[in-house]
């Protein structure tokens, strides 16, 4: 039995009836207390009554905190409306709405410097509620229940800037909230135009997805436009995505429905930097340097760092060791990222590097040019690994 309305086993029927009885006190506050809605929570917790009830009650608290009953009337800040790259456009053959997220043209740092994290998350929750409303409208129009949505992630232009830690943490928080509060609404998450870097990005967020959600991720290869029409009819796909749909003025991107984002103008910035917490603090003495070594086991891994200095600027560069097991001077190693001085005492620095070969990479902080003052640095360094399954799939494209 699928666990869907009309296809329940006797034990599932019994669980549904008991579940409804257990949550009588909140039924009237639910957005739609019918069997379809209740079964979403039971399915998400494999019909475990206590876990399903706990999940639903936590969601009710979430609804109050986010004021979801009124969120469709809420207007996001202008910068979010203009540059948060997403939109609803078209339906699949079963009537499910299609939501686009144009990740490759998103400017995560610009958005987080121009709006609060809560405003950006709230805009995402608003999109979820818009999708649920569209499902209801489709149900009325088609005379059958439409419960699920298709998500298309466009990754053309995905780059190292998209692995910026605060931006990834925002995405992790969104997926965590999505799993907890919008169970069983995703039919497929289709990824198109994915560069190899996607395997690293996916590995950073997959732990915030349920196993069921991860199974719904579909990566389309070079022939993605034709493959996409197997999921969605061409007349429901923008020309930009291989279909025939255009805006009334003929625009192939359907800009009236999908926001493609772009770089956020600095005129929108509310602050100069996003506050970060660092894992390590060390002193770099006058005329000396500090080496932070990281072992990279295979090509395709990514080094990500953030640092700030106190007491003046600090020099920084990245090197690859030529001999294992011993400390080397800078001139004895291969320079991977050219060394230069950074005003990290004024503006914290962050950076990302794709490691093209295995080996020991050294992040070198240097104060060799200062004969009087020592510097104090705070830093975080991480090695980001690609998801091996997706990396193998993408290498076949």
Swiss-Prot record:
Domain of life of the source: Eukaryota
Span of the signal peptide: none
Family annotation (Pfam families): CRAL_TRIO (PF00650)
Domain CRAL-TRIO positions: 76-249
Domain GOLD positions: 252-383
Annotated GO CC locations: cytoplasm
Stretches that traverse the bilayer: none
InterPro entries: CRAL-TRIO_dom, CRAL-TRIO_dom_sf, CRAL/TRIO_N_dom, CRAL/TRIO_N_dom_sf, GOLD_dom, GOLD_dom_sf, SEC14/CRAL-TRIO_domain
PANTHER family: SEC14 RELATED PROTEIN, SEC14-LIKE PROTEIN 6-RELATED
Protein name, UniProt field: SEC14-like protein 6
Name of the gene encoding the protein in the UniProt record: SEC14L6
């Amino acid at each position: 039995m699928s666990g869907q309305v009309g296809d329940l086993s006797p034990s599932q029927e019994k669980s549904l009836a008991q579940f409804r009885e257990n949550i009588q006190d909140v039924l009237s506050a639910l957005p739609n207390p019918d069997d379809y809605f209740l079964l979403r929570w039971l399915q998400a917790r494999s019909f475990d009554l206590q876990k399903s009830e706990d999940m639903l009650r936590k969601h009710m608290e979430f609804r109050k905190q986010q004021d979801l009953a009124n969120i469709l009337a809420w207007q996001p800040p202008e910068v979010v409306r203009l540059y948060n790259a997403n939109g609803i456009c078209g339906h699949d053959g079963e009537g499910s709405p299609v939501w686009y997220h144009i990740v490759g043209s998103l400017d995560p740092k610009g958005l987080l410097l121009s709006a609060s994290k809560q405003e950006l998350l709230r805009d995402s929750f608003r999109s979820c509620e818009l999708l649920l409303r569209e499902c209801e409208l489709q149900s009325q129009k088609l005379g059958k229940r439409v419960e699920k949505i298709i998500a298309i992630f466009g990754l053309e232009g995905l780059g190292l800037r998209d692995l910026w830690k605060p931006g990834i943490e925002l995405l992790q928080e969104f997926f965590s909230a999505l799993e907890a509060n919008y169970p069983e609404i995703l039919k497929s998450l289709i990824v198109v135009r994915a560069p190899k870097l996607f395997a690293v990005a996916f590995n950073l967020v997959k732990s915030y997805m349920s196993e069921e959600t991860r199974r719904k991720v579909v990566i389309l290869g070079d022939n993605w436009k034709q493959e996409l029409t197997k999921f969605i009819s061409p007349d429901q796909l923008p020309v930009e995505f291989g279909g025939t749909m255009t805006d009334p003025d003929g625009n192939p991107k359907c800009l009236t429905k999908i926001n493609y984002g772009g770089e956020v103008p600095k005129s929108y910035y509310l602050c100069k930097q996003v506050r970060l917490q660092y894992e390590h603090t060390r002193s770099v003495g006058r005329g000396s340097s500090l080496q932070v070594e990281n072992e990279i086991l295979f090509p395709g891994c990514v080094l990500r760092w953030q640092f700030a200095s106190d007491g003046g600027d600090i020099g920084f560069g990245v090197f690859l060791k030529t001999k294992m097991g011993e400390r080397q001077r800078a001139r004895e190693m291969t320079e991977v990222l050219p060394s230069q001085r950074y005003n990290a005492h004024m503006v914290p620095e962050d950076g990302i590097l794709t490691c093209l070969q295995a080996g020991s990479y050294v992040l070198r902080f240097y104060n060799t040019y200062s004969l009087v003052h020592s510097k104090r640095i705070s830093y975080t360094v991480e090695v980001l690994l690609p998801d091996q399954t997706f990396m193998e799939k993408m290498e076949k494209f």
